Amino acid sequence: MEIKRALRNSWLASILACSSACLCASASNPPPLGETDAALDLLLTRKAQEILDTHRLRESKPLGASVSASVDISQRKMVIRFGPGVLPLEDDHSLEEMEQYVRNTLEAYALQAGVGEVEIVVLYEGRLYWEHFPRSVFAPLQAVPRQAGGSVLVSASHGLLRTHPGLQWEFQRPERNGILEDLITPGYADELAQLLTDRANLTVHRARRGGNDIHPDSMRPWKEMSARYHLKNLLPERTDIWHHFANSNRNDREVLDDIRARPYYANHLGVDGMLSIHTNAGDPVARGSRVHYHPSKPGDRLLADLTLCYMREIINSQDGYVEFPVARSGVAAGHGENSFATMPSVVVEVAFHTNAADAVALQDPVFRTASMKGVEKGYRLFREGKGCVPLKAEPIDGIHLPAGGAQQVDVVFEGYPQYPIELVTTNVGCPPGWKCTDSRVRIERPGAKPSQVTLRCENTGSAPIYWNTQVVDDDGVKSPPVPHWVQCIRGPGSAVASPGVHAGVEAATAG
């Protein structure tokens, strides 16, 4: 602990020495209980204040509103406290981008300081944001009863929107590291939609429209447009869905319409779930996958956790992504996209387009497929009432075999692999002068054949043979290898193979 603290203090000192920002934290907030680090809290507060001030300048609002941040290191909990004057007059989503940027940046700094992943609580004048705006989703918005067959809304983030008063058409996010979030997320949503159809047998609805045909008002392809305009075209009479902020005079009021339209459309459809696909933004040091659920819907946390569980399992199984960071648990955050949805819903932040390494991953089809397979699997197993169970094979006992003998060995595993699977047995210790052959047993579907490998001794000598066996599924997920051994025994005569050895199954052989 002392070494970690010394390293953290050294890192913080170097950061603080380069910072000349003014500390604007409120002195009225009491320090949190538990282990604290004053230098870390100072750094986090300064970074949060910088982001808040930048946001208020962009919004043409006066400076002076304060924010502070502190970390309880022993509990791994960060509290971000916004002071008076920050909240809008109505719940209009105008703080979402700023709050998320603060969260992501401070989380990354805490991680760099050696604190590890932290739970983050954001308070506005001492209360959670949504507690300032009690809400209920109006029943008329859910026009279609939910069907037992299963349906889901997949919502790719952002898209072109009209800004006021000049009525220019603009993308909602700036380009960073060669990525425009508005244009890259539809490809992820396409992949996810196909997986949900093929693997989960669900009816998939889309918030944004694809295709190269032209949106008549902007004269841009429909695939570039935000959900607001697709829903206006699809449901012209439902202004309550796509024009919620009709009375707003904000320049970005159609941005706010777009955020609110997505959950309202999900409610209208009566789907069973809503999956929103985004790329993330923050300080360039922030990276990795996150999944957000709304704090007013704590039941959605399980969906967020399962989504991350299986994103991690599949992403980290791909070459080049073994150490790609995926958060351990879902984040409670106030996104309008899922706070107004009546069904389980999460916001999936696939990776950070503001981080150079993540940006490279986001443009890689291997990463895109792996991440969306994880989202689909998490949602499917959530619907099936299953949990986070990474693929793992149980221990395999060693066996003794006479020369010429063979025995089938059960490979018992836990988890939910994507079939077909292979049981892969690899030799890791072969006696000098012997020939040891690896084996692969392919199982097309659950129950198609016993989960067994055949081990064989063909040499007339006596020696121990060492093997590793693992389960490999169709998504490339590999269970950790299980070591086991076979003791080949010299003896008169030859043994007969155990009953039930299947023809065509390649045996792991030593001889």
Give the role of each language-model region.
Residues 52-83:
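Short edge beta-strands and adjacent turn/loop segments
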Residues 99, 103-135:
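A short amphipathic beta-strand at an alpha->beta junction
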Residues 139-263:
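Active-site histidine-acidic residue metal-binding/catalytic motifs
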Residues 166-177, 280-306:
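A short, glycine/acidic-enriched catalytic loop
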Residues 245-257, 316-339, 391-396:
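Short catalytic/ligand-gating loop segments at beta-alpha or beta-beta junctions
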Residues 276-288, 292-293, 323-389:
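Active-site-adjacent mobile loop/cap segments within catalytic or ligand-binding domains
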Residues 449-461:
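Short, hydrophobic beta-strand segments
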Residues 476-508:
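Short beta-strand elements
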